[in-house]
């Protein structure tokens, strides 16, 4: 069954992760070969966060992303107060996606998408009754921040899959570096 809605799930809170989202994840989603190339879909950025981070997120979205349709959901809006916030956010977006017959893309703030990757995944899966999952390598945030990736994203330059693979191999997270020992 073909679907004409895409929900982008963004669970993000805390200064470090909000900055990562605005510096890397959101610009990578907005590369011309990703969300802009899916204009025939209704796309909603579903942001799940804490109450004290809402204004910072709204400011970041209003600065350069005025054409994005977004919805912010907070922990207190959902009416729960236990410690398993991420699980509750996850259940909520799964339910909404199912009820509204929307395709779902996970976009945690530590993900960087190559140009065309979202478009390709949507076109590959839509209407076929399948899901696509792709593991992403953990990388050193210090290593990435020392690169010119942030500058390239701000200048709307295309970020290729090849470049991201090289970036991940050059900036391995410590847990990956010693995984085979």
Language model regions located:
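Short beta-strand-to-loop acidic/aromatic patch adjacent to the donor-nucleotide binding site
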Residues: 99-114
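Short helix-terminating capping/connector loops at secondary-structure junctions
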Residues: 2-3, 36-43, 100
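Short loop/turn segments at strand-loop or loop-helix junctions that form parts
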Residues: 6-14, 50, 72-78, 134-136
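Hydrophobic targeting segments
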Residues: 5-10, 29, 42-47
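Active-site-proximal specificity loops/subdomain of glycosyltransferases
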Residues: 48-103
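Structural alpha-beta junctions
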Residues: 30-42, 63-74, 126-133
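Conserved catalytic core of nucleotide-sugar-dependent glycosyltransferases
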Residues: 81-89, 94-95, 112-181
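Short, well-formed alpha-helical segments that are part of the catalytic scaffolds
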Residues: 16-37
């Amino acid at each position: 069954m073909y679907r004409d809605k895409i929900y982008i799930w963004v669970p993000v809170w805390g200064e470090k992760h909000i900055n990562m989202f605005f510096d890397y994840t959101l610009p990578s989603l907005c590369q011309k070969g990703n969300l802009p190339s899916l204009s025939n879909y209704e796309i909603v950025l579903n942001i799940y966060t804490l109450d004290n981070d809402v204004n910072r997120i709204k400011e970041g979205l209003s600065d350069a992303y005025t054409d994005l349709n977004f919805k912010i959901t907070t922990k207190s809006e959902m009416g729960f107060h236990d410690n398993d916030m991420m699980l509750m956010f996850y259940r909520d977006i799964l339910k909404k996606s199912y009820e509204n017959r929307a395709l779902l893309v996970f976009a945690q703030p530590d993900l960087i998408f190559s140009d065309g990757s979202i478009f390709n995944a949507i076109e590959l899966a839509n209407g076929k009754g399948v899901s696509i999952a792709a593991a992403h390598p953990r990388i050193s945030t210090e290593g990435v921040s020392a690169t010119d990736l942030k500058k390239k994203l701000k200048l709307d330059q295309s970020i290729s899959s090849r470049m991201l693979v090289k970036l991940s191999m050059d900036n391995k997270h410590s847990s990956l570096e010693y995984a085979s020992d």
